[in-house]
């Protein structure tokens, strides 16, 4: 499909009363911000941003430039401007966080909700379906392939654990941390299981037992497990659902577990396969002293542009000119550092 078809779908969710309450109170799409606060920045509204990358990025020769000050970003802002003016995008997207957006999407009260939602792949597909089912909302979700105008959904760089060098010239402390934490984190056995699934007997078990989720409600479900069968137990913070994971997502482990414990559902696996097929790697994140010093100020200037163009319907060229005047010296210093090598 292409942009025009996608936008027509959003307008249908906006204008054709999908919640059936006779009121004009639904939207085509919503997101946690018109631009993300962290890389890859565009992932919650990918069809609008398409191949624009509104941060420091690099060309095919490896030369860094400011991706916000580009025609691609201007075009994306104009698409967002039109959607805001048409009432297609939830205006609360300007200030909502991810928790706000997903809870509005699966809420039992669908007035004020929206149709299209871009979120994380993998086990989050299960979370969305489970929460919609729990709230009595139709969970027949359809995954959308990328529109023709974009290369694919962005596969962001993974968050990482780091050991900070204390600068004393002696690596023994850092090596000890690596040996105690990282080596055991991926030992394929007991400690990795703790990182992935949590504590035995509390988050998971291999003992015979009966587990009931949503006990006493119309969503009550019973699970029977035999002795020796690995299974997850009740979520300590939500007795209507089973526990899913600890710090490491079991569907994206870089080292397999020797005990063969497996919890990823078919839905999670299908979602991961779909994403792998339809995604491209996001650009590497930029890092230098200038970004540390000026990143917040530059992001504030970007948000001024977005508010002026998207929310107020202002002129995109004038807003971008103001961005350049505000940030030029900082951007030049950052690009000088990034391209120094």
Language model segments and positions:
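Extracytoplasmic/secretory soluble proteins
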Residues: 1-341
């Amino acid at each position: 499909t292409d942009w025009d078809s996608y936008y027509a779908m959003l307008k249908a969710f906006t204008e054709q009363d999908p919640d059936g309450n006779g009121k004009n109170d639904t939207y085509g799409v919503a997101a946690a911000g018109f631009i993300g606060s962290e890389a890859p920045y565009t992932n919650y509204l990918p069809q609008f941003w398409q191949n624009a990358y509104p941060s420091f990025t690099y060309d095919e020769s490896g030369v860094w430039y400011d991706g916000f000050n580009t025609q691609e970003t201007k075009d994306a802002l104009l698409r967002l401007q039109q959607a805001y003016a048409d009432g297609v995008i939830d205006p609360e997207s300007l200030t909502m966080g991810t928790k706000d957006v997903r809870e509005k999407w699966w809420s039992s009260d669908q007035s004020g909700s929206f149709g299209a939602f871009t979120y994380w792949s993998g086990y989050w597909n299960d979370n969305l379906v489970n929460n919609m089912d729990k709230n009595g909302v139709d969970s027949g979700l359809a995954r959308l392939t990328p529109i023709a105008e974009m290369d694919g959904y962005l596969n962001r760089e993974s968050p990482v654990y780091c050991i900070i060098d204390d600068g004393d010239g002696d690596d023994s402390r850092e090596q000890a941390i690596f040996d105690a934490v990282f080596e055991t984190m991926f030992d394929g056995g007991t400690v990795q299981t703790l990182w992935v699934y949590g504590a035995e007997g509390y988050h998971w078990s291999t003992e015979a037992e009966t587990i009931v989720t949503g006990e006493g409600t119309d969503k009550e479900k019973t699970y029977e497990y035999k002795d020796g069968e690995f299974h997850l137990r009740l979520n300590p913070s939500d007795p209507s659902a089973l526990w899913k994971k600890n710090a490491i997502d079991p569907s994206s482990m870089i080292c397999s577990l020797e005990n063969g414990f497996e919890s990823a559902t078919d839905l999670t696996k299908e979602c991961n396969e779909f994403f792998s097929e339809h995604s491209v790697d996001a650009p590497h994140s930029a890092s230098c002293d200038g970004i540390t010093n000026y990143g917040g100020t530059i992001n504030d200037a970007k948000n001024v542009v977005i508010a002026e163009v998207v929310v107020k319907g202002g002129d995109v060229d004038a807003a971008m000119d103001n961005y350049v005047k505000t940030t030029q010296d900082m951007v030049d210093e950052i690009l000088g550092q990034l391209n120094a090598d």
